Amino acid sequence: MKGITVLLTAILMLAFSRCNNSKKKSMNEYEKGTYGYDLNFLKEKDKGLIVLKGDNEKAEVIVSPKYQAKVFTSTSNGPDGTSLGFVNHDVLNSDVPDEHMNGYGGENRFWLGPEGGQFSIFFERGREQVFNNWHTPKAIDVEPWDVKEVLSTEVSLAKDMELNNYQGNILKISADRKIKLLSSGQVEQELEVQLPEGINVVAYSTVNKITNLNDFQWDEKTGTVCIWMLDMFNPSDSAATIVPYNVSDEKEPGIIATTGYFGEIPSDRIRYESGILFLKTDGKYRSKLGMNARRTK
């Protein structure tokens, strides 16, 4: 896969499902857990909701300008198919905003750090860094983003923001985000695989960029910001996260993954196999892993 320039990130989300035929139904007939249900629900919350559609009429991706350019959810099998992203209906229905962070959900969402430390953008200068004083910047929590361009399979959004960090500096930032629905052919080309017949696929890439709008450089004195991408999916007993990694010939490529953030991940929940890491993500165990740059693909 092609490399991305500095301050850009690219994410490829994939989901597969067996083909099945479904009759078209009115939106209010879809069951909770289906893509059709979430599409109907989100249209009521964001009148400017954007739906990217593939040429097979089954792959769709929901993007919300109102809710911080989130990819809320997607499907590989049309309205009757499973809604793959986690949509927090209770929070979206609430009339009372959370002063710390509004957990709307989202299959792919733009986030910024650092959350804590001397350059935190989540704490006011001089305030003790405890949860009661922790507040998410509004630009990535409750404010809408601007739509720059919309095509049938891609959308570009942007947001200008000013962030106060723990040093008392105001960091002026322009954030840009492009989301593109990929065809089956593009998936095969990017991943160098042959998709089996009888399989539906939904895949998209996101490219995310931040630009310094200050009249000074960000450095070890002023502080800086970093991009995070946070992804929330609906778990299942068979759900797994697949992470390709480099099988290096170097003498010291480093361990494949750091797996002890919340205690070591049990061996029955993680497996390494010929350059691919498999992590069980059934929602029944909290875990976290990381890879160094020499291992990541």
Range-by-range predicted roles:
Residues 1-29:
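Bacterial Sec-dependent N-terminal signal peptides
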Residues 20-205, 209, 213-219, 223-297:
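Surface-exposed acidic/polar loop and edge beta-strand patches at domain peripheries
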